[in-house]
Amino acid sequence: MAAPVAAATARRGAPLLWRVEWYGRRSHLFGTVHLPLDLDAALGEEGRAALADAKRVFLEIDTSPDAALTFLLQALHRARLPENESLHALLRPTAWTRLTTATKGFLPPELLDRLEPWFVALTVVHLAVPPGRPVPGIRPGTLPLDQQIGERARAHGIPIEGLESILDHLQVLSRMPRKEGVEMVEEALANPAANRDALATLVGAYIAEDDRPLLKAFGQLARRKPALAERLLYRRNQAWCERLMLWLRDGRMFVAAGAAHMFGDRGLVTLLRERGYLVERVRPTAASPSTSVRTRG
């Protein structure tokens, strides 16, 4: 894979925020993490102003309470294994034992046994993470960044659009090959403490506005699990870019999506540049001018 274009000139201390311009009409692109962090700090001064002034906000999916309930109900419907299959039979015995131990008191084994591996990987295995020092920057009781953005937009009467529908989002998850889902569950259960430490590293990097650990994690995913990266990132980036083309030329759009969607030669930053948009990383005022590409086309 080519070096991540979006960070080719990245310096420490810049938020994951880009200006997106079309002949003087400016919008903003913001890379999030789906975790409860300080939104104002993550956005920086220009990001806060851009969100407050936006004509329309785009999130990966609609995060309104009604949409969240719809998502949960549809996810649960898709999460049930066929009657002749069981999670117990799909996992290695050691993984099943670790999983049932971790979920004791939260989820009965007979219910757990009926769940698809992809659903367990995304919603259940975090229970296996052993207690430890709280991850610095995580704010228990706070909404994830993208949901905070949605709440703020709704409070100011700013229309919100999903980059994809709830159905599209669920299909990305539920169409994960069974083998891939099993591998994700077993990998997460193999060393939960290491997963906690890795999360702490990424959260710390995001808060410190240090791209390097984030880019490293992105590169590892792209190299080690190319099929997952294709389905989870690249195909969605392409679809989202086509959707955004209908709006960005009007200016004052605020687009927030997971940070990994910004990076690489198939990330949103590069895709928009290839379509003629001027895309510049927002730098602190004291920083030297950006050296990003300024030509269209």
Question: Predicted segment positions?
Answer:
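Compositionally biased, proline/threonine/alanine/serine-rich low-complexity intrinsically disordered stretches
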Residues: 1-11, 171, 179, 204, ...
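Structured, acidic catalytic/metal-binding patches in enzyme active sites
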Residues: 6-9, 14-232
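C-terminal soluble interaction/assembly domains
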Residues: 230-297
